[in-house]
Regions:
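N-terminal secretory/targeting leader peptides
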Residues: 26-121, 133-343
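Bacterial N-terminal signal peptides that target proteins for export
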Residues: 1-12
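Intrinsically disordered, low-complexity, polar/charged regulatory segments
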Residues: 128-129
Length: 343
């Protein structure tokens, strides 16, 4: 009897030891809400490869299930979807949430020194790490990646814009924050629209054009409604991949470290480089080969200088004064840091 009792005790002890190993070895599946089509450039060249990097870094212990094309949450709802646990992770256009992260808007000021998404992404992540005032405004969710597009281009359907005078009065889809003020200063009428709604708005003439990067042109079939592109001193846009805090805190520390090993600064630069910078080459090639019926015009330096004086530098000062007026006393210091980091 004693032998049986000892055997039972040993068996129970073995189960007690082995059971946690079995549980920890189970795959953790995380959901990621995305507004973009799974076939569009950014997801194919950045989001999906990053997901694979996470899976590799965690030795397969983490799997991420992407829900594309707003199938889990609408684009404008993605921040709250992550916060409320509707999804574990979400891809966010930060301009959809005016006033949520005002310090971070510094990187969407027009005319900053950086000219690529990769450099802009480096700037915003370093600001996020350096200034608690920046990171605290993202505190509702766990931030995995912060990245920017390259400075926007202006796309129009019926009128080619070559001068400030050409832009005046045009209804232009833009994003929230400083780009709205720039468009007003340049004489355009800013319109806030989610990217999935732009095609129909352009087709119906609800808007005359839009500010965006090159990347969404094929994914949102903008080549069918855009006839002209103007390259000038426009602002970029800011994006974030975030995670529900409770879910993040539930992950083992080694899993957290593995995820951040492919996120953070290097992950942000990866997204900026692959989501946006790399997209320009094939799209411009399609235009050059006549596969897209679009004309590209780059502002000459003299005209560009006019735009900078009218629609860039005054916006910087306006942003600082507005921020300081709302109690955000670090605005000028953060702007100066962004200008220095962006060189």
């Amino acid at each position: 009897m004693k032998q049986m009792t000892r055997f039972s005790q040993m068996a129970c002890l073995a189960l007690f030891v082995l059971f946690p190993l079995t549980v920890s070895a189970q795959t953790i599946t995380l959901t990621l809400s995305d507004q973009n089509s799974e076939m569009s450039w950014g997801p194919v060249h950045a989001t999906q490869p990053w997901v694979k990097q996470v899976e590799k870094a965690t030795n397969g212990k983490v799997k991420i299930q992407i829900y594309p094309s707003e199938t889990l949450a609408k684009g404008k709802q993605n921040w709250m979807a992550a916060k409320d646990g509707i999804c574990d992770m979400s891809w966010n256009v930060m301009s959809y949430y005016p006033g949520l992260t005002p310090y971070a808007d510094v990187v969407v000021l027009p005319g900053l020194p950086f000219r690529t998404g990769e450099k802009g992404s480096e700037v915003i992540w370093k600001l996020f790490e350096k200034f608690p005032e920046v990171s605290d405004q993202f505190a509702e969710n766990k931030v995995l990646v912060l990245y920017t597009s390259e400075p926007f281009i202006l796309m129009t359907s019926k009128k080619q814009v070559k001068t400030l005078e050409d832009l005046r009065g045009l209804k232009i889809r833009t994003v929230g924050g400083p780009p709205i003020e720039q468009m007003k200063a340049l004489g355009g009428q800013p319109m806030l629209l989610p990217m999935p709604d732009v095609y129909v708005a352009m087709e119906k003439g609800t808007v005359d054009g839009l500010e965006a990067a090159y990347e969404p042109i094929p994914g949102f079939r903008l080549n069918e409604v855009v006839k002209y592109i103007t390259e000038g001193p426009f602002a970029p846009s800011l994006f974030a991949v975030v995670m529900n805090k409770k879910k993040w805190n539930s992950l083992p520390k080694d899993i957290q470290n593995a995820i951040m090993s492919v996120s953070g600064l290097e992950g942000s630069k990866f997204f900026g480089r692959n989501f946006f910078d790399a997209a320009r080459v094939p799209i411009k090639k399609m235009i050059e080969e006549g596969k897209y019926d679009i004309k590209i015009y780059t502002l000459p330096e003299t005209e560009r200088a006019r735009w900078v004086e009218v629609g860039c530098k005054p916006i910087w000062e306006q942003w600082v004064k507005s921020m300081e007026g709302k109690g955000h006393k670090k605005a000028r210091e953060i702007l100066n840091a962004a200008l220095e980091m962006g060189k």
